[in-house]
Amino acid sequence: YQGPEAEPEAVLGALRKAGYRTVATARREDAVPLDELDLEAGPVALLFGTEISGLTPETIAGADGALWIPMHGFVESFNISVSVALCLQELTRRLRASEIEWTLPEEARKEIYLDWIRKSIKNVEALEARYTSERER
């Protein structure tokens, strides 16, 4: 996405305002290996760059922290889908093995599910209006 909402400062600010710590997946002096990311410090938003150019220097510098994915052999980088999968697998495994309360509250799950349903159904506004008018009769 190339709109103004994609500017690094706006993205990082919105994530922080929503209560997330931002962690760039990039080599930075303070970067930690994926398996050492502190999950006790609260909700985290991982930042991934494009396969060609990675994260912008502004995003890397502006993130609250950074992590790197350990690689072995002759590999210098993973493509984006592999990087995301490796991070999600490791962090999910660690969260499930921890005492951290990481699941979404029931109300938040319902909101996300309803949002997904609305985005999945054609003419959802018309269907909701019809349903509402029929209930009011």
What are these model-predicted stretches?
Residues 1-137:
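Post-transcriptional modification and biogenesis factors for structured RNAs
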